[in-house]
Amino acid sequence: MEYMRAKKDVFRFDGYAGADTKYRLKVSVFTEEAWHSLFAKTLFINAEPNELPNWSNDWTIIDASRLELEDPAKYGVRQKLCIVQSLERKLVLIVGTRYAGEIKKSIFYAMNYDLPEVGVFPMHCSANVAKDDPSNVAVFFGLSGTGKTTLSADPKRRLIGDDEHGWSDRGVFNFEGGCYAKCINLSQEGEPQIWNAIRFGSVIENVVVDPVTRVPNYDSAARTENTRVTYPLDFVPDAVDRKSTRLNSSHEWI
């Protein structure tokens, strides 16, 4: 906390995880890097401006991405990089990593812990729905990087979300308000929905960018194969509105 207080600028995001108002969590994210705050704004569901003056959150994330612990053992951890999460205090501390994915995964962990107690099955999956039948929902399970985003990006169906969902007796609902897609070897021909979503307002991560032309090189794995892009559902044509509380009925094809 002292480290963050000493910063000239700290960026704050307030919003929700969970499109279903019955089960959503109110989240506040404090970051030292502006692009991490933009990441949170893109991935979570934004609070309305009139909600912010009296905002009271369920979970707090403190993202000290540039902090390196000089003596990790002093704090009960093994290395300078750590993600510490307290389910009792509803607090997440991210230290020493600039990988923005830790922000979203920490809240997914929280929802995995809390929601089964209230009858919701948390799922690491993508999901879409038929354009003419809201009861025809498909979910695609898989670990990170196995193609969930690609499979759900079907132009003949409406995207619900690409990574984290809940399944209750009220239907399937998205935990998030955006997508977090891998973009190694991305092409317009192969994955047009993802390609077209990369524009002003999206965030590319770990992608090599030409220093002169500023054109991303999606074929390069010079830094890592885990190259990513984050974009709001608003950037996907005919996607289910990320602020919508309308649910899809429980008729799922897996």
Q: Where do the PLM segments sit?
A:
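Long, basic/Gly/Ser/Thr-rich N-terminal segments
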Residues: 1-97
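Generic, well-ordered alpha-helical scaffold segments in large soluble proteins
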Residues: 3, 109-114, 131, 154-158
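Short acidic, glycine/serine/threonine-rich loops at helix termini
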Residues: 23-30, 106, 141, 153-154, ...
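N-terminal pre-Walker A segment at the start of P-loop NTPase domains
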Residues: 101-127
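Glycine-rich phosphate-binding P-loop
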Residues: 130-162
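Conserved nucleotide-sensing/catalytic segment adjacent to the nucleotide-binding pocket
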Residues: 160-225
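Long hydrophobic segments that form regular secondary structure
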Residues: 224-244
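Single conserved hydrophobic/aromatic residue that forms the stacking wall/gate
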Residues: 243, 247-254
